[in-house]
Every structure is written in C-alpha cells, then in structure tokens.
Amino acid sequence: MTKKSFLKYLLIPTMTLVIAYPILSPLAQKSAEHQPAAHKVIAYYFHTNTRCSTCMKIEAYSKEAIEKGFPEEIKNGTLEMRVVNYERPENRHFMKDYKLVSKSLVLVNMVNGKQTDWTNLKLVWQLTGHKDAFLNYVRKEVRSYLAKG
C-alpha cells in the first residue's frame, strides 16, 4: 500500500466524521431532550360514554388537584394527567389492566418507561361533596407516587 492510498483511507473516515458531526449533533440533542423521564407518574381519569354530573365533577376536581398542585412536575414531565374513555375500542384494555368497574382516577408509577405499580383512588367518589378534602386526598396520593422516584 502506498503512502497516498494509506492517507486516503485514513482521511476519508475522519472527514466524514467532521462533516457529519455538526449535522448529527443537534439531532442527538433533540433525541436526548425527548427521552422519557426516568421516573414518571401518570394520573388517568377513566370515564365511559355516559357522563353524569358527579363523574364530570370528579374529572374537574382531579384536573384541578393535579394541574394547580403540581405545575413544575407537569412542566418537567414527571407528572402527566390523561383523560381516557375506556369504552372506546382502543382503550378497552384499560378495564382489564386496572380492574376498572366504573369511572376512576388511577395513578400509575412509571420507571424508565415501564409500569411498576398503580393504585385506584377509590375515595374520590365519597369526597365529591367535599372539594377541599378531595383535592387534599388526590394531592397526598400523587405526592406519595412522586416520592417513589
């Protein structure tokens, strides 16, 4: 192998790396920015096609407890609130996943994108007539799940 051909093999990969780095670097940064949080809590409010006033109140109070109680956690992605109609075909698996028998607020603990445990906050039904107690109950349970991280 001549000195010239040796340099050709040595320089081409180096030049490719130098050229590709500025192009790939922002993509790598964006990819890292969109990685799921190592620990995350998802609060699901599950409802059906039929929505009574109590069910609507549970959803509204749940959103208020979470959105006003944990704005930083929502912003940084460690807490998320999802409202899901579990009667829709694509969501029916949730009935089995979380043993749903009625409208429910369920907290799910996620670690590295995998569910580790969950709990159904069953007291929300008894607390709908006591807004402050409802908000405190939900926030206490969410705090407990956030502390698992």
Locations of regions flagged by a protein language model:
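N-terminal targeting signals for export/organelle localization
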Residues: M1-S31
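Charged, often glycine-rich, active-site loop that binds/positions anionic groups
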Residues: R92-L100
